[in-house]
């Protein structure tokens, strides 16, 4: 699939990026190559290929879900300039 220069201009405008006129030819060729690759990938017959959720057939080992850090919440509350009912109080910033 070949891309036209006008399409690259439109895409760059919609993406809010600036593309120099000197880069348009090179960018058009690169994007066209990527689109050609996608077309070739779509042409591959995958009818007898089972979908995969992961490239490896191994099961991940899971670690035991154990608390490894102590709770410092109360200590941090004491360090705060203002705290109430476990919440940090901050000055109002919006009227």
Swiss-Prot record:
Would you identify the family this protein belongs to, as annotated? Belongs to the GatC family.
Q: Which GO terms describe its molecular function?
A: asparaginyl-tRNA synthase (glutamine-hydrolyzing) activity; ATP binding; glutaminyl-tRNA synthase (glutamine-hydrolyzing) activity
Catalytic activity annotated for this protein?
A: L-glutamyl-tRNA(Gln) + L-glutamine + ATP + H2O = L-glutaminyl-tRNA(Gln) + L-glutamate + ADP + phosphate + H(+); L-aspartyl-tRNA(Asn) + L-glutamine + ATP + H2O = L-asparaginyl-tRNA(Asn) + L-glutamate + ADP + phosphate + 2 H(+)
Q: Which domain of life is it from?
A: Bacteria
- Spell out the subunit comment: Heterotrimer of A, B and C subunits.
Xref: PANTHER family: GLUTAMYL-TRNA(GLN) AMIDOTRANSFERASE SUBUNIT C, MITOCHONDRIAL
Per its UniProt record, what InterPro entries does this chain match? Asp/Glu-ADT_sf_sub_c (IPR036113), GatC (IPR003837)
Q: List the disulfide bonds.
A: none
Q: What does this protein do?
A: Allows the formation of correctly charged Asn-tRNA(Asn) or Gln-tRNA(Gln) through the transamidation of misacylated Asp-tRNA(Asn) or Glu-tRNA(Gln) in organisms which lack either or both of asparaginyl-tRNA or glutaminyl-tRNA synthetases. The reaction takes place in the presence of glutamine and ATP through an activated phospho-Asp-tRNA(Asn) or phospho-Glu-tRNA(Gln).
E.C. numbers: 6.3.5.-
Name of this protein:
Aspartyl/glutamyl-tRNA(Asn/Gln) amidotransferase subunit C
Record's keyword terms, sorted: ATP-binding, Ligase, Nucleotide-binding, Protein biosynthesis
Give GO BP annotations, semicolon-separated: glutaminyl-tRNAGln biosynthesis via transamidation; regulation of translational fidelity; translation
The encoding gene: gatC
Q: What class of enzyme is it?
A: ligase
């Amino acid at each position: 699939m070949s891309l036209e220069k006008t399409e690259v201009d439109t895409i760059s405008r919609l993406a809010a990026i600036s593309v120099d006129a000197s880069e348009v030819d090179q960018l058009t060729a690169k994007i066209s190559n990527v689109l050609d690759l996608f077309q070739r990938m779509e042409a591959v017959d995958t009818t007898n290929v089972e979908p995969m959720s992961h490239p490896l057939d191994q099961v991940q080992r899971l670690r035991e879900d154990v608390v490894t850090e102590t709770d410092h919440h109360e200590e941090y509350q004491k360090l705060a300039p203002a705290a109430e009912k476990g919440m940090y109080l901050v000055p109002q910033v919006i009227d």
